[in-house]
Structures are given as structure tokens and as C-alpha cells.
Regions:
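A structural "flexibility-hinge" signal
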Residues: 1-188
Length: 188
């Protein structure tokens, strides 16, 4: 099975990056690098959320009821109104009160200013959920299958970009134990 992360990243072609960069006030390279850092982090946080039955079922129900992937049918159109979309609410569920810390960590890791990074995450969250919802639907996944998919995505991200994921983990690892998992758990 192809990586969800790669499928999401492949949606950001030159035209899409140009539009998004214009909205964020950044260049395409900075935007592309920030997307490449933010998508695996979002997938990892969602994976962590599926670590218990309640979180797994909650994510499954959200995907089943609200995120069928239709957003992907007109991505350029969505980008035009993304700040009014469901992204802020999704981020609130995923990161809770630690959202600002996540934004600041990604900002430091990528060089994108925190304000632009926050707006980028608001834009990316519904896209990631749309991909997961569409994949869940196409593959007939139940809650356990979804948790397995997200766990595989987290492993793939670690293997594909160990340096980047290591940098992000260092910024998120507030207690210095070498893992951001406990901090992500506290965020969820």
C-alpha cells in the first residue's frame, strides 16, 4: 500500500504550492519544507490518539461522519477558504491546549514564522483527515485497521526522514527522555 504521507505530499504541485505560499507570505521552498514536516507530525499525533479504544473510536467516527475525502476533489478551491474551514477544530482535538507549542516547535524546525505555520496547520488538518477518511472508506477499514494504518505511517515517517523526525521529536520532547510520545499523549 502506498504511503498516505506520500499521497498527501504529492497533492502539493507547483500551482498548489504557489497558491498556498501566496496566502502564507512565504516562498514555495519554505512552504514545501513546512508541509513535509507538518504532515508526518499530524499523522503521528493522530496515530497516538488511536492508542486507546476511546481515541481510536472517536477518530474513526469523525472520519466516517465528517471526512469522506470530498475536500480532495477540489483542493485548490478548498485552499481559497481553508481558514474558514474545520482545521482549527481538528487541531484542537489533535493537540489540545498544546497547539501553540506544536506550532512553535514546527516553526523552529522549518524556519517558517509561527503565524504562517499556524495557518498552514489549519489548512493541512482537514486535508490529512480527508485522505484518511477516503482511505478508510475505499479499503473498508474498521477502527483497528485505521489504527494499524496510522501506526504504519508513523514508522514510515521515521524511516523516510529520520533526521527531520528526530528534529521534531527534540523540539517536542519537553522532558528530555528522548521521545515525544509522552508529550504527544499529553496533548491528545
Amino acid at each position: 500500500m502506498a504511503s498516505i504521507m506520500n499521497a498527501i505530499l504529492s497533492q502539493f504541485d507547483s500551482d498548489t504550492l504557489d497558491q498556498l505560499s501566496g496566502q502564507l507570505g512565504t516562498n514555495q521552498q519554505t512552504t514545501g519544507n513546512a508541509i513535509a514536516a507538518a504532515v508526518p507530525l499530524l499523522l503521528s499525533a493522530l496515530s497516538r490518539n488511536t492508542g486507546d479504544v476511546q481515541g481510536r473510536d472517536s477518530l474513526y467516527n469523525a472520519l466516517s461522519n465528517d471526512h469522506d475525502g470530498g475536500i480532495l476533489d477540489n483542493l485548490i478551491g478548498f485552499l481559497g477558504g481553508a481558514q474558514q474551514g474545520p482545521g482549527q477544530g481538528i487541531l484542537g482535538h489533535v493537540f489540545g491546549g498544546s497547539q501553540n507549542g506544536v506550532v512553535n516547535a514546527l516553526s523552529k524546525a522549518t524556519g517558517m514564522d509561527a503565524s504562517s505555520m499556524g495557518r498552514l496547520l489549519v489548512t493541512l488538518a482537514p486535508i490529512v483527515m480527508g485522505f484518511l477518511g477516503r482511505t478508510r472508506q475505499q479499503q473498508g477499514m474498521g477502527p483497528s485497521g485505521l489504527a494499524g494504518l496510522l501506526g504504519g505511517e508513523t514508522e514510515y515517517a521515521q524511516q523516510a526522514a529520520p533526521g527531520l523526525m528526530g528534529t521534531i521529536n527534540r523540539f517536542l520532547d519537553q522532558n528530555g527522555n528522548g521521545s515525544a510520545v509522552d508529550e504527544l499523549a499529553g496533548m491528545l
